[in-house]
Design a protein with these regions (language model features):
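Acidic/histidine-rich catalytic cores of soluble enzymes
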Residues: 182-318, 325, 334
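Hydrophobic faces of well-ordered beta-strands that scaffold small-molecule active sites
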Residues: 26-32, 62-68, 98-102, 149-153, ...
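Flexible, acidic glycine-rich loops studded with aromatic residues
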Residues: 305-410
């Protein structure tokens, strides 16, 4: 299995003077969707208990960036004037700022079955547009001067929802409505505001080829309207695109060639295994009932087979004894610093390839978010003493990788 032991030098990679704005205008945070937060009180409690503890251990006193997750309910409660003012004062008092919001999960995200409901409402439904607008209204008032703001969202829909042509058309129009809204709000506030569709296996947008095709459909709705290039892009989740067996360099170049903005990059790792009988048995510890853990199997001839969930992959018959084994890449977010052992691997090479591309082209993306939301459902052997310990080690690993590529803390 995977060990929580650090896959880095704990001396060379210690986090003693880190702030979360890096050179070349890069911003780095961890996504607070790792903590429970179904209403604002629970969200704020997580910030007070966990985020401040992480900040105390990784920041030397410079401005500390927060990647905020807000459910629909939490966002409605936060916009109440007294509550919002109190949060602004809390940020100021703690020398913290918000530059990005995770607007993917609309409702409950911890403690009960989520699975396909994480994609609902999708972009064919008015609730998704209303929720996303509200998130941007919140973000625009939280952003420091001169800092751009991003929100990540569902990849249009989930393929198994089987949306009708009318519903597909409605999704296109609602995304354009959001572009209109962001253009007006950006003009009003002076902030560069952009929404990122987050490709994910088995969704409307699974990979960069599907992203390019979908953005062509969007542009065909309003030929010549270039505002889409500024306000709508892709939230590139390294775990998700690695599961699709994409080459980082080719995937990023494909998006760039199509004029699609990289709104944000999720720094995340997936599981990668050869499904021997022993590995299949061990994988049952990851086949839990809250989140989808899609599996994409690359067979020995290079063809890809998609499984909706890890349970489904484990239910398939194993290859005959002695037959070549396929590779399974599994949608289970693994701590960035986890060290492979016992036949388990991660897709960290994909993440490193993305950072190499950013190093070669620093203007590629400015927003980076570590996203390992699976803390509560990880097998016990993977967990460290506390979620704060995990996050601190993820910061250390990530900042070391940025430093190797010349990106240093500012402040």
């Amino acid at each position: 299995m995977l060990s929580p032991n650090r896959a880095f030098d704990p001396v060379a990679d210690r986090v003693q003077s880190a702030v979360m704005q890096l050179t070349d205008g890069l911003h780095l945070a961890y996504c607070t969707n790792i903590h429970r937060g179904e209403d604002w009180a629970e969200t704020f409690a997580g910030l007070e208990r966990h985020t401040r503890a992480v900040q105390a251990r990784v920041s030397s006193g410079g401005p500390y960036a927060i990647g905020l997750r807000l459910s629909d309910r939490a966002s409605r409660e936060l916009i109440e004037p007294g509550t919002f003012t109190a949060f602004q004062e809390w940020l100021k008092r703690n020398n913290a700022y918000v530059f990005t919001i995770n607007g993917f999960p609309y409702g409950q995200f911890h403690g009960q079955r989520v699975k396909e409901q994480v994609y609902a409402p999708d972009w064919s439904q008015p609730e998704r547009l209303e929720y996303t607008r509200r998130l941007f209204r919140i973000l625009a008032q939280l952003l420091p001067p001169g800092v751009a703001g991003s929100v990540s969202t569902v990849p249009v829909s989930y393929k198994a929802f089987r949306r009708t042509p009318d519903e597909e058309e409605r999704a296109l129009l609602q995304l354009w409505d959001c572009v209109d809204f962001l253009d007006a709000l950006s003009e009003k506030t002076g902030h560069d505001l952009h929404l990122g569709l987050e490709p994910e296996p088995l969704c409307t947008l699974e990979n960069t080829e599907e992203c390019v095709a979908y953005f062509k459909r969007l542009r065909d709705v309003r030929p010549g309207d270039r505002r889409i290039d500024r306000h709508l892009g892709v939230n590139y989740d390294c775990c998700h695109l690695a599961i699709e067996y994409e080459s980082p360099a080719e995937a990023l170049a494909r998006l760039q060639s199509a004029g699609i903005r990289l709104s944000k990059i999720h720094l995340s790792n997936a599981l990668s295994v050869s499904p021997t009988p022993e590995i299949r048995q061990a994988l049952h510890a990851f086949a839990e009932d809250i989140y989808f853990h899609q599996v994409i199997e690359r067979q020995t001839n290079g063809s890809l087979v998609r499984h909706a969930d890890l349970h489904d992959a484990l239910a398939t018959p194993p290859p005959a004894p002695g037959a070549p084994l396929p590779e399974w890449r599994i949608h289970f977010h693994i701590p960035l610093h986890s060290e492979p052992r016992g036949g388990f691997n991660t897709t960290a090479d994909h993440l490193i390839g993305v950072l190499d591309a950013v190093h070669a082209q620093p203007g590629l993306c400015q927003h980076f978010e570590m996203e390992t939301y699976t803390w509560e459902v990880m097998p016990a052997g993977m967990k460290q003493r506390d979620v704060v310990d995990q996050l601190v080690d993820e910061y250390a690993w990530t900042l070391a990788r940025f430093a190797e590529r010349g990106f240093q803390p500012v402040g």
